[in-house]
């Protein structure tokens, strides 16, 4: 069987060679939602003969923005973002459908379990009030990435040997998401961020940026860290840095 698992992500938010770690949630969950709003198309000159899904979509978007601020405990970490709005193809025609889509991220498993029902309630309620109907597709993608305290302490101890105590830093939760989280639901996990930022090398651009570049000089340290973690989990000593 597998006793524990370790992983790392290169991290442009930390200086090259630094290691970011924390116990508990370290990366958020990620779910995708898509709402199809059905109205009734018509001519823009005669809106009374149509049922406008575009206005309805705008109202749904505005209402969704109050979910985090009005329904969530302020101490919870939740992000609800709208990433797509589609409606119509002509400037003088009221379309019959509109589509609103986005994503939800949180570090709470309980909050995550509630979000589909909340979004459905908002979409159905707004659409009913504005004579439209809503069809929600909600797709869970990645769970919360949670670091086991014991495994994380082993990883930190290995990092002290490989990178030095001065290069270990505590990091806040990142609201990005990671499929490594699935492993953490099965066995104790330790996931860390390996800094790559070096302005002179051009490796300080944000992730998913066209100018993002990996600092290759740091990668061997990451490999050494994972090897040291595995050795410590097996009760073996690892070479000093």
Whereabouts are the PLM-identified features?
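Histidine/acidic-residue-rich, glycine-tolerant segments that coordinate divalent metal ions
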Residues: 1-95, 177-178
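Metal-dependent amide/peptide-bond hydrolase catalytic core
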Residues: 54-241
């Amino acid at each position: 069987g597998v006793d524990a698992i370790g992983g790392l992500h290169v991290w442009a938010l930390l200086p090259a060679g630094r290691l970011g770690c924390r116990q508990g949630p370290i990366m958020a969950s990620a779910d995708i939602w898509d709402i199809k709003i059905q109205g009734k198309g018509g001519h823009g000159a005669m809106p009374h003969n149509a049922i406008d899904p575009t206005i309805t979509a705008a109202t749904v978007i505005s209402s969704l923005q109050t979910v985090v601020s009005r329904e969530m405990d302020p101490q919870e970490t939740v992000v609800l973002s709208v990433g797509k709005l589609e409606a119509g193809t002509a400037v003088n025609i009221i379309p019959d459908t509109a589509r609103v889509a986005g994503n939800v991220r949180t570090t709470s498993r309980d909050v995550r379990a509630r979000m589909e029902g909340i979004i459905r309630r908002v979409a159905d309620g707004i659409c009913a009030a504005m004579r439209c109907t809503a069809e929600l597709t909600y797709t869970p993608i990645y769970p919360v990435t949670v670091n086991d305290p014991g495994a994380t302490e082993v990883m930190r101890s290995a990092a002290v040997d490989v990178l030095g105590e001065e290069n270990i830093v505590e990091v806040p939760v990142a609201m990005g998401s990671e499929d490594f989280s699935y492993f953490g639901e099965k066995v104790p996990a330790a996931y860390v961020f390996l800094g790559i930022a070096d302005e002179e090398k051009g490796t300080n651009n944000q992730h998913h940026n066209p100018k993002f570049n990996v600092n290759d000089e740091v990668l061997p340290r990451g490999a050494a860290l994972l090897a040291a973690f595995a050795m410590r989990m097996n009760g073996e000593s690892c070479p000093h840095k």
